[in-house]
Amino acid sequence: MSTPRIVVGVSGGVDSSVAAWKLAQQGEPIAGLFMQNWADDGSGDCRAEDDRRDAVAVCGVLGIPFHFRDFSGEYWSDVFEHFLAEYAAGRTPNPDVLCNREVKFKHFLDAAQALGAERIATGHYAQVAHRGGRWRLLRGADRGKDQSYFLHQLGQTQLAATLFPIGDLEKSTLRRIAQDAGLPTHAKKDSTGICFIGERDFREFLGRYLPARTGEIRDPQGQRIAEHPGVFYFTLGQREGLNIGGVRGRAAAPWYVVGKDVANNVLYVDQDRDSPLLQSRWLQSEQAHWVTGAPPARRFSCTAQTRYRQPDESCTVDVQDDGSVQVRFERPQRAVTPGQSLVLYDGEECLGGAVIAATDAPLERQLAGSSFSSEVVA
């Protein structure tokens, strides 16, 4: 068996299948590697075995070697324990960002290099370019599928060793390529959600690791409205799952989460979807990561996303002495959530990002006892 120059992360999905096919068409000596990142206990719907069989089948069609690596231990210690700690603290984490940084572009890269490969390739919708002496992370051509948001923690070492073969394709084109190439995954549905939860009820799953305490649901004036099953099951702006029935003297309208008092186990709700209590003009992050290794300037203007697939929002960024950033948006943002990722862009280039630590949303700021001042970036 010849040494592969490139190892492709084959997930058993259509995206990684076409990524491998494109490289094979170019005559590159490649191999496929399937990563198992969660030790499924049989009660979920991760479908890891089905995905593995599909990955084996794709490698067979392409005539390339197949490899398997179990990273479930690394995933548990590097991703899942952080996921639980964030929820326990009342924040809403994004495990996909951490999985990319710690597993797919660290442990997977190490495994590929151990096989003798120079580079790895994945089926992410993103692009890499080398400009001005630095590697740049760019959005995928299909803006509806772009995954640069989840890749913003990558750096120069990872990007120098990474290929995104499908980054220049639209999803519809990719499906046609897969069908024409006879790839067995051409009609396979895209995976959704977090693998380790699968199709399970989120509360049931999280409750296995974080025992919940019931508590009060209150309106912004502090009046008791209902009872919740656990404050960390909910995130800002959420409507589903509150199970608030008819409340005497209140309109028959939906309720939305506008605040979480983790210390006192109280959830605050309002019937205004765009409640002023959910609006933020400023945010404070934890330490930021820059794709090129440094920010463009100490203060600069760019666009930002505070949630995946959110429209770009214009903002001003101030880099602090401790490496964190403070961000001022041109217009108020709804339900900016601590624990989620702030990702910054200059046109098509992803500059980097950080975890959101605090905002100036009135109720959340009061509950957190935040000293964050919007005057810093005004």
Swiss-Prot record:
GO cellular component: cytoplasm
Residue span of region Interaction with tRNA: 145-147, 307-308
Alphabetical list of InterPro entries matching this protein: MnmA-like (IPR004506), MnmA-like_C (IPR046885), MnmA-like_central (IPR046884), MnmA-like_central_sf (IPR023382), Rossmann-like_a/b/a_fold (IPR014729)
Site feature (Interaction with tRNA) residues: H124, Q340
CDD domains: MnmA_TRMU-like
GO BP annotations, alphabetical order: tRNA wobble position uridine thiolation
Binding residues annotated for ATP, in chain numbering: G9, V10, S11, G12, G13, V14, D15, S16, M35, G123
Cysteine disulfide partners in this protein: C99-C195
Enzyme Commission designation: 2.8.1.13
Residue ranges, annotated region (Interaction with target base in tRNA): 94-96
Intracellular or extracellular location(s): Cytoplasm
Gene Ontology molecular function, alphabetical: ATP binding; tRNA binding; tRNA-uridine 2-sulfurtransferase activity
Keyword Nucleotide-binding: yes
Enzyme class of the recorded protein, top EC level: transferase
Keywords from the UniProt entry: ATP-binding, Cytoplasm, Disulfide bond, Nucleotide-binding, RNA-binding, Transferase, tRNA processing, tRNA-binding
Swiss-Prot/TrEMBL catalytic activity: S-sulfanyl-L-cysteinyl-[protein] + uridine(34) in tRNA + AH2 + ATP = 2-thiouridine(34) in tRNA + L-cysteinyl-[protein] + A + AMP + diphosphate + H(+)
Active site: C99, C195
Protein family membership: Belongs to the MnmA/TRMU family.
Function: Catalyzes the 2-thiolation of uridine at the wobble position (U34) of tRNA, leading to the formation of s(2)U34.
Protein name: tRNA-specific 2-thiouridylase MnmA
Biological source species: Xanthomonas axonopodis pv. citri (strain 306)
UniProt gene name: mnmA
